[in-house]
């Protein structure tokens, strides 16, 4: 029997393809019919309508939350279409979706259909093939992704950065290299939509950071997670209303919900998130946040209960329906994006100016002190 190679598993004819919601105008009538059914179908219909309400509310900033491995599963184009059509204003995600999967594909690499039932994971390991349930990835290509992040970090001024700033630099790099025009990172960069990855070191970017900081131990780029939280809180305070569109749970879900509490700590009267939709298969009974209900979040003062909906379904089934419904209802057509990248960059510029003024003031005091001593 011939020894198997990478080519036996990474078949160019068996690629994961990203679904195009623009093709499915019939999703509107289907989802509306779901309203007259029961169980998860009715929940999904209500969730779809709540998302459409977010888009129709001109003062509402929509934050998309992504957890798990959704981009490798074929949902990338949905997120890109939401960005292109001003249907989301900020993204909070796991690093896997943004770096290991979206940036990975922006470099020209692909995800392949696999076999979760008959996979020999020891053989896959020997062949440098990584498995995400029923999907395969070339590990050697993933290492190129790690190294590319490393190279980008080497070009930056050594200082603390929010993940949003690093991802913006990655978008800038893609533009310069003329790569990834169909990627989330590049599209968000082009549209002025910030992407936050609170656990940024927990992905390919983390390997890039390890290499960068080892190579430059005394002067390097660092991650400022508190700045991520502050920037997202500033968006919450700036927005008249906010809506959360959460696909899966995890850190992104809690991170954005907590901005209401953070705003309160800063003495700002910022209302609870007015709209909230979550698609998840997680169970609430273990006390973990991924499965905690949105009603539970209301007890913490984070989410209003009037317009919230949990949908207990796997994301690759529910997300195309919810987003296709909203896309073909066309409330987004009269909606303008908030360009929160510009908002945050302007804020950074003000802070930099304040620092410069403080520095000049300190230098003047030192100079005056030296003159006094000479006298």
UniProtKB/Swiss-Prot annotation:
Keyword set, alphabetical order: Transferase
SUPFAM superfamilies reported in the protein's UniProt record: DHS-like NAD/FAD-binding domain (SSF52467)
EC class name: transferase
Listed EC numbers: 2.5.-.-
Disulfide topology: none
Superkingdom field: Bacteria
InterPro entries membership: Deoxyhypusine_synthase (IPR002773), Deoxyhypusine_synthase-like (IPR023496), Deoxyhypusine_synthase_sf (IPR036982), DHS-like_NAD/FAD-binding_dom (IPR029035)
One GO location term (cellular component): cytoplasm
An example Gene Ontology molecular-function term: deoxyhypusine synthase activity
Gene3D superfamilies assigned: Deoxyhypusine synthase
Keyword Transferase on entry: yes
Family membership: Belongs to the deoxyhypusine synthase family.
Name assigned to this protein: Deoxyhypusine synthase-like protein
Species the sequence originates in: Elusimicrobium minutum (strain Pei191)
